[in-house]
């Protein structure tokens, strides 16, 4: 079995980055929908303790936070690896024309774009859900006075 090669990196970097970001976007959508459903059905009167309510209200928000915080870095990693492959190809071939380099660079940047495409909607969902959690918590405090 052979060791690491740039050809292997070239073949699998996009697959790896897109798979990680695809799973992250699926999880973000799943947990955001779960929270929306929970918030629409939560019965504040069923809780006696603010701490128990806050535990239930903030469940899965950390996962959304981790996804929006790390998705751009996963995309950036894909871009850096893609650029490394381009530089390697330039070195091996003894030079490339500007058109080939620009095409390679633009293709390498797609990983960063995808990372941002996952992070931005997840950030919006996270902040919206966190605000809803805060509002429900305050409604509980007012109700218990």
From Swiss-Prot:
Q: In this UniProt entry, which cysteines form S-S bonds? A: none
Which GO cellular component terms, listed alphabetically, does the Swiss-Prot or TrEMBL entry include? plasma membrane
Q: What's the short name of a Pfam family annotated to this entry?
A: MotA_ExbB
Instruction: Give the stretches traversing the membrane.
Output: 13-33, 67-87, 101-121
Q: How does it sit in the membrane?
A: Multi-pass membrane protein
Q: Which compartment or compartments is the protein found in? A: Cell inner membrane
> Which processes are annotated in GO (biological process)?
protein import; transmembrane transport
Instruction: Could you list this entry's UniProt keywords, alphabetically sorted.
Output: Cell inner membrane, Cell membrane, Membrane, Protein transport, Transmembrane, Transmembrane helix, Transport
The question of whether Transport is a record keyword is answered with yes
UniProt KW Cell wall biogenesis/degradation keyword: no
Q: Which family does it belong to?
A: Belongs to the ExbB/TolQ family.
Q: What does this protein do?
A: Involved in the TonB-dependent energy-dependent transport of various receptor-bound substrates. Protects ExbD from proteolytic degradation and functionally stabilizes TonB.
* Quaternary structure (record): The accessory proteins ExbB and ExbD seem to form a complex with TonB.
Task: Kindly provide the name given to this protein in its UniProt entry.
Answer: Biopolymer transport protein ExbB
Q: Give the organism, scientific name.
A: Helicobacter pylori (strain ATCC 700392 / 26695)
